[in-house]
Amino acid sequence: MSSYSSNNNPIETGQNAWLSINSFPYKATILEQNTNCDWLILGGGFAGLSAAYRLAHLRPKDKVVVIDALKIGEGSAGQNSGFMIDLPHNISASGNYTDSLEKDKKTIELHRHAMRFAKEIAEDCNVAKEDFLQIGKINGAATESSSVWNDQYQKQLLDLNEDHQIFDRKEMIELTGSEFYESGLYTPGTVLFHPSNYVRVIATKLRESFEIFDNTPAISMNFQNNSWLVQTPKASISAANIIFAINGHIQNFGFYKNRLIHLFTFAAVTQKFSSEQLSGRDQWGITPANPVGTTVRKIKDGDGFRLLVRNQFIIIH
């Protein structure tokens, strides 16, 4: 008999700013009665909900259940900066883009395939257009020395025959309303999205086809008699198959010991500003030309705007 258990459940100690920005009204459901299914998906983030959506098409007669230790949209899927980026930009310490063209092309196609799938889900589940914007992003250079990184990136894009546009200082001021940036490199393929709304709208739509439970962590799982018995705080689930979609939390069940490094990035969102206080275009996203720089995004919030700023990280071994 195979047996796995975890005494450590995901917790969130901070406030998710996205839940205060045009937040989708989502109702949580907790598993309180025993149930069974063909497929149990652990994790209600991007991977878990995408797997559920795909199973609904591939195995429409199978019963699918999704559980998440937190309320959908409150975990990492609902707390990132909301960039879906199609183009690789792998930078060596010397400032050179080092990946081979063939490898880059394969990476780009993989990214775009995933983004087409995400767009399909968004459209099928009625994610609001303002929560899924394909408006591209800018690699922003705040200093002349940082512009060198964009020069290297442009060489890579030319070799890949990818569309891009160089923004000078004046154009960056027109875009951002700030004199902070010296230049920028724009690429059109990036999607800027509202992370928590994206997963919550999808989860709400998918509930029409199968069961999704919030605040229902898996505590233990045992394989016996050709099925898995998964225990949660208030009930158990008998499942023929289990899909793990829980990112680094999988280590707490005993998998991948000493093989994963957990990387956390930290961001903050400002108070709401008026268009007079925060000029420039309504919405944009900037990633740093220098890989250790700051990611900034302007977000429309009702009749005002906010800035998201991300520039710190920690690594946990």
Predicted stretch roles:
Residues 1-39, 57-58, 62-63:
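Extreme N-terminal leader/targeting segments of oxidoreductases
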Residues 43, 87, 232, 239, ...:
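Short, well-ordered coil/turn residues at beta-beta hairpins
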Residues 43-49, 69:
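Glycine-rich Rossmann-fold phosphate-binding loop(s) that bind the pyrophosphate
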Residues 56-79:
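Glycine-rich FAD pyrophosphate-binding loop
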Residues 75, 79-110:
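Glycine-rich active-site loop/strand segments that organize a redox cofactor
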Residues 82, 116, 124-132, 218-220, ...:
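Active-site substrate-recognition segment that forms the wall
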Residues 98-205:
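Rossmann-like flavin
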Residues 179-240:
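Helical element adjacent to the flavin cofactor pocket in flavoenzyme catalytic cores
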